[in-house]
Regions:
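Hydrophobic alpha-helical segments at protein termini of multi-pass membrane proteins
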Residues: 1-211
Length: 211
């Protein structure tokens, strides 16, 4: 399940979604001048592609087995490969510079200005992102296995998009405080996890589905 999760993330988020971005930014280059439109587009695109990949991957996995472990495993693979590609590469570059590898002055200056707090914040953000992916995977798993209506897939798309808003605003410079941005991300991700836990309790704990 983890391998399917990793593969679907790569295929849907890193290939198909990037192709859409290339087409949209080519046809509508002015979208970057409108923060609200740019944020809405980017967050909804991420939610749509990643949750559609989740839906397709879990639909494939659940053909023979419908156990909760499939949803959990998918979330580990999806969130794990994202963390490895996003945070892992940055951590490797930072470690290499700190160990004395040659780097451009701009890189070393940026690392010095960021301080240890930025690295801690990145780690906390990745943990929060992993929890989000686990929760959304369980939500889509419940939809695939008919424990909840299929429209919960669309709820997953919107929840994913909402969780991406703070990071998008931070990238646009509209959230200048790193800790403010991280605090909002943690709060939103925690709210999503609590929502999914509530749905899971009602659908699977209090009214378990046989088979």
């Amino acid at each position: 399940a983890a391998l399917v999760g990793a593969g679907c993330f790569i295929g849907y988020a890193l290939v198909l979604e990037q192709l859409l971005h290339a087409a949209v930014f080519s046809l509508f280059p002015a979208i970057t001048l409108y923060p609200a439109a740019y944020t809405a587009y980017g967050c909804l695109a991420a939610g749509l592609f990643e949750e559609t990949g989740r839906l397709m991957g879990l639909s494939l996995l659940c053909k023979k087995d419908r156990d909760l472990a499939l949803g959990v495993g998918y979330g580990i693979g999806h969130g794990g490969v994202e963390a490895a590609l996003l945070a892992g590469v940055n951590a490797a570059v930072n470690a290499a510079v700190m160990l004395g590898a040659p780097a451009a002055p701009q890189v070393t200056d940026a690392l010095g200005a960021a301080g240890a707090g930025a690295f801690w914040a990145a780690g906390v953000e990745r943990i929060a992102a992993m929890a989000l992916h686990m929760a959304l995977s369980i939500l889509v798993w419940m939809a695939v296995t008919r424990r909840v209506p299929i429209w919960y897939y669309f709820a997953a798309v919107l929840l994913h998009a909402a969780a991406n808003i703070p990071a998008a605003l931070s990238q646009l410079g509209l959230l200048r405080s790193m800790w403010c941005s991280e605090g909002i991300i943690l709060a939103v991700n925690a709210a999503v996890c609590l929502f999914v836990w509530s749905v899971y309790r009602k659908a699977c704990v209090h009214r378990p589905l046989a088979g």
